[in-house]
Regions:
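Amphipathic alpha-helical assembly/interaction segments
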Residues: 1-116
Length: 116
């Protein structure tokens, strides 16, 4: 898959793989509510990044901005999962650090798209 040569796509793809493996550590009562929402958002973010990577310069910006909003919402949901103790603080720190890195990459992509 050539698209994984794009660093932000690879980082998000790898995060999903890690996130998927954490599923069984989440209490069952949260697994089918908030966790499922987070997992869906992560897939939507991955889809948005892939879609944006294949668009012309003029069509990228709105897609990237929508993806950024989804990323911010995902961060909020992950924080909520930590606060309700659906995930451990250690898991939260790991996931949040990766999300921050993806956010910086996405912000840079948005900025470079606006400058063109």
């Amino acid at each position: 898959m050539n698209d994984l040569n794009i660093p932000i796509l690879k980082k998000t793809y790898d995060l999903y793989k890690d996130f998927y493996n954490l599923r069984l550590t989440v209490p069952k009562q949260d697994r089918y509510t908030l966790w499922q929402k987070c997992e869906g958002l992560l897939i939507e973010i991955l889809q948005g990044l892939l879609y944006a990577s294949q668009q012309s310069k003029t069509e990228k910006l709105p897609i990237l901005e929508k993806t950024s909003v989804k990323l911010n919402f995902l961060k909020m949901c992950i924080r909520l999962m930590k606060d309700i103790k659906a995930i451990s603080p250690k898991t939260y720190i790991t996931v949040e650090a990766t999300l921050d890195e993806i956010g910086k990459m996405l912000g840079g992509w948005i900025k470079s798209t606006k400058e063109r």
